[in-house]
Amino acid sequence: MSQDTLFDKVWDLHKVANLPGGSDQILIGLHLIHEVTSPQAFGALKDKNLKVKFPQRTVATVDHIVPTDNQSRPFKDNLAEQMIDTLEKNCIEHKIKFFNIGSGNQGIVHVVAPELGLTQPGMTIACGDSHTSTHGAFGSIAFGIGTSQVRDVLASQTIAMNKLKVRQIWCENKLSNGIYAKDLVLHIINQLGVKAGVGYAYEFAGPAISELSMEERMTICNMSIEGGARCGYINPDEKTFSYMKDKLCSPQNENWEKAVKWWKSLESSDNCVYDDVFKLDASKVEPTITWGITPGQSIGVNQKIPSLNQIHPNDQFIAEEAYEYMSFKPGQSIKNTPIDVCFIGSCTNGRISDLRVAAQVLEHNKVAKNIKAFVVPGSEKVAKEAKEEGLDKIFIKAGFQWREPGCSMCLAMNSDKLIGNQVSASSSNRNFKGRQGSPNGRTLLMSPAMVAAASITGKVSDVRDFINK
């Protein structure tokens, strides 16, 4: 069993009690909620005449179902209007901080919390959303929970969990030019398999991880769940502290130095013990694209669709289904695959650095005539910053639609959907069957830069052909 890792330290600090059956009762330092998984939880509190235990440790925003084309109230979508109105009323009743549309701080919950300084090293963070692992980029232990656990956290600020094992993923060397965090994490999931992380927390480390910006680290941790891990984290360092300093909710003045000193003490010790260690050479990673129906089914842009015996054993069970659904054959090149829709956004890649990279590719270029392309900033703050830098004009001039913040086509709960058997180049995190709104829609996951390149050519392309000119 792991010893003296950051995960062990944070877990032990937040363990309230040992429970019958071997699980632990864990205190949650920050509870993030949104409009989709919270209504039933609040309803359960009302049924039992309970109040939120620590409303000051709960923060809400709207993201999943909000329209990105027209956010004037009331929304055209009655369900969206109802869900957001319900969250607003629940937050007022229970005195919970709520960042609504137009507040300047609304957006995807996993984008908003870090940019406000709510996410901090050493925290336990829970949210009714799979990609809560994003916050582990700051050295927190963050995990998605179901609606019943959302209820438990609202009522008690604790949940029952079995302690996870810890696997260190050591990324040697550095990423090459034109290779991004999205490429690296897709490669990791491909190498380990989509079930390898079950029962584990992933600690990402090594020179390649140290080189990444905080926003790139969030991309890595965001997709931990796609490799089966309940959470993923990175030890905090000077980049972490620099990013957090002077954020709205970060410690201020003399409390800042005290906080940094404590955060540094949480780092995995030199003599810590991991349950497993996986090593890879980051310098060998190519621009990576999914070809199948799990994030583990990915290849480099210049590679061919693998045959069954070339696929990781953990992924073989759906490989044949993926061939049929995606209309790919073993040995077929992924490069030059025609694209219909290009989407840049999501909690994985909807931050300002993602938009900057994509805009650099798009500048002085035009979206192909057959392509529908749109960019959805991850938050109102990201949108504001992008407009100040003129990024919105670059996207619009190239032929992209500029949208308002929200989850959008990542999960297609609003009107942003694929139609029929359209193929999308998407910077989101999941390529499951029907994920982007159409039962027959096909999703190719890739970095924002690769999406931008695909939008120009109308097909899967190597972004290095654009940035190395």
Curated annotation (Swiss-Prot):
Species lineage: Bacteria, Bacillati, Cyanobacteriota, Cyanophyceae, Synechococcales
**What pathway does the annotation place this protein in?**
Amino-acid biosynthesis; L-leucine biosynthesis; L-leucine from 3-methyl-2-oxobutanoate: step 2/4
Q: Name one Pfam family in it.
A: Aconitase
Q: Which Gene3D superfamilies match?
A: Aconitase, domain 3 (3.30.499.10)
Q: Report which gene this protein is encoded by.
A: leuC
Q: Which domain of life does the UniProt lineage start with?
A: Bacteria
Q: Which InterPro entries match?
A: 3-IsopropMal_deHydase_lsu, Acnase/IPM_dHydase_lsu_aba_1/3, Acoase/IPM_deHydtase_lsu_aba, Aconitase_4Fe-4S_BS, Aconitase_4Fe-4S_dom, IPM_dehydratase_rel_enz, IPMI_cat
Q: Which reaction does it catalyse?
A: (2R,3S)-3-isopropylmalate = (2S)-2-isopropylmalate
State the EC number(s). 4.2.1.33
Tell me the organism: Prochlorococcus marinus subsp. pastoris (strain CCMP1986 / NIES-2087 / MED4)
Q: What does this protein do?
A: Catalyzes the isomerization between 2-isopropylmalate and 3-isopropylmalate, via the formation of 2-isopropylmaleate.
Q: What is this protein called?
A: 3-isopropylmalate dehydratase large subunit
> What's its top-level EC category?
lyase
